[in-house]
Amino acid sequence: MANINFGFEHHASKLYSGAIEEGIQNSLVPMVIETSGRGERAFDIFSRLLRERIIFLGSGIDEHVAGLIMAQLIFLESEDPDRDIFIYVNSPGGSVSAGLGIYDTMQYIRPDVSTVCVGMAASMGAFLLASGAKGKRASLPHSRIMIHQPSGGAQGQESDIIIQAREIEKIRRLLEEIMAKHTGKDVQQVREDSERDRWMDAGEALEYGIIDQVFEKRPAPEKKD
């Protein structure tokens, strides 16, 4: 059976996601204490962000991570189908099937999904960054974005390997068509550009059509009279 991934995930996400998992296991996730008339309540930082309709994708993308992201998207739609959802992306990429599950959910739900790259969006991370609502995709100035073709391993009898190779090519074509739709590039251009790792800074990603704006600094709130 073919196991299709974006190849960069193999040498980038193990250390990255491992550090995240170790931090969680060591209870290093910050807690936020809120006080009300009914006393104090403690939230981990990610749950608190979820209340503000913010989802943080900060690891490699596998089936477990995708399940969490999809569940949060569907939950926030049920809370308010008319308010935007924000996904902050800092990911080296990962499983194609898991990433497509997130992608389909982003397109399926009613709220617009705004995407922001903070740090790195490589491979499937870049794919999801580009998949945000048009006009609502952004990056911080020193983030790095990378696109490339998916990779996959095949094993078994010759006939099985041929079938799996065809499936990998079919998936590659699908990903190129989706990226072309969201960036405004033609499919052949996307194929040529993603033949090898193509790294971009925020300005280059803006020019390519992966994002719509570069955030230098959050605007100061308006002063009340």
From Swiss-Prot:
GO terms for molecular function: ATP-dependent peptidase activity; ATPase binding; serine-type endopeptidase activity. Gene3D superfamilies: 2-enoyl-CoA Hydratase, Chain A, domain 1. SUPFAM superfamilies: ClpP/crotonase. The keyword Cytoplasm applies. The gene is clpP. This is ATP-dependent Clp protease proteolytic subunit. Fourteen ClpP subunits assemble into 2 heptameric rings which stack back to back to give a disk-like structure with a central cavity, resembling the structure of eukaryotic proteasomes. The active site is at S123 (nucleophile), H148. PANTHER family: ATP-DEPENDENT CLP PROTEASE PROTEOLYTIC SUBUNIT (PTHR10381:SF70). The keyword Cytoplasm applies. GO terms for biological process: protein quality control for misfolded or incompletely synthesized proteins.
